[in-house]
Amino acid sequence: MASNTDQASLEQEVRSLQAYANEYSQQFELLTQQLRFIESARGEALASTESLEAFSGLEGDVPTLLNLGGGISVHAIVTDTKKILVGIGAGITVEKPVEEAITFLHDRVTEMDASAKRLSESLGKLQEQMRAVEQRMQEIYSQTQHR
């Protein structure tokens, strides 16, 4: 009878471990998506910084291509190369000198780097937890095979 109780206990533990494994897998996917988003936004900010740095040395009317979205662009003339419109969040855009816009983007990249580091650390901890669950499930499997 103790054997039936042990078997039921192991089955319950396996179900619990499977639930943990599923939850950890979902968390891992979510964190991975967040990390990819941050990496994409970081790349965009760095590209914008490079463009602004090139822009800051220009004088007068500057011809450019303006991306309208959906793969559509138009030729445009930038008449003021000293002031840039910067989205600061929550749909708010402010006018800033180019140098301040560059600093703003550098600060944003620094914040994204810190967030990416935290996410990477969380992913590492989550992987450790997933390995522990997998190891315990292997132990249970081995126990049931040796009976």
Curated annotation (Swiss-Prot):
GO molecular function annotation: unfolded protein binding
Keyword Magnesium carried by entry: no
GO cellular component: cytoplasm; prefoldin complex
Keywords on record: Chaperone, Cytoplasm
Domain of life: Archaea
InterPro entries documented for this protein: PFD_alpha_archaea, Prefoldin, Prefoldin_subunit_alpha
Subcellular location: Cytoplasm
UniProt cross-references to SUPFAM superfamilies, sorted A to Z: Prefoldin
GO biological process: protein folding
The protein's role, per its UniProt record: Molecular chaperone capable of stabilizing a range of proteins. Seems to fulfill an ATP-independent, HSP70-like function in archaeal de novo protein folding.
Classification via HAMAP family: PfdA
Protein family per UniProt: Belongs to the prefoldin alpha subunit family.
Subunit structure: Heterohexamer of two alpha and four beta subunits.
NCBIfam families: prefoldin subunit alpha (TIGR00293)
Name of the protein in question: Prefoldin subunit alpha
Species assigned in the record: Methanocorpusculum labreanum (strain ATCC 43576 / DSM 4855 / Z)
